[in-house]
Amino acid sequence: EPLYLRVKPGMEMAAAFLDSRKYGAIRGATSEFTKMEGVTHNPQDKQLFVAMSMIEGGMVADKNGRRPQDHIRLEGDAADLNCGGIYRAPMQGGQMDSDGSLIASEWVAASMSGYLMGRRKPAGQTVGPYDRCDTDRIANPDNIKYSSAMRTLFIGEDSSNHLNNFLWAHNVADGETVRVLSAPIGGELTGLQVVPDI
């Protein structure tokens, strides 16, 4: 491992708090994520959703640099990856930590994969003439919130790839995704909450 990633004996606790990302990587954690933003969960199906505003840098194959772990090696068009996406992680029990000890929880993310992905604007799309990502798909998701009652994942954008940031509603039961709100130019959709029965 590179010299700058060594931890002096007895300083593990300090390292864990002073530079959690690097120390986690030394311990085997995946550290290549770029622009990881909102997190929410679906308790009925035991799924965790994570907004990845941009997919670049260490997440892309052969772009990891000197990081001690290289768990993520995505391939694909950089213009598509630049539009970000929502990742989904099933949660389950029976998982071990990096020391081989059983984690005493049934809510451990065991794997993660792309779920709802943005993509570059297709040639000939006339809607959203200033958008660089497909106007009919999410772009650079930032804030997310899951509603158990509605079985719906709400996704707020913070994107320079859509002129207007959108709020999307994705039904996890039927897979339908609809745009429900367009913010004014430069307006970020943040602080998402679901308040049933108003």
Residue ranges and their predicted role:
Residues 1-198:
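Conserved small-residue
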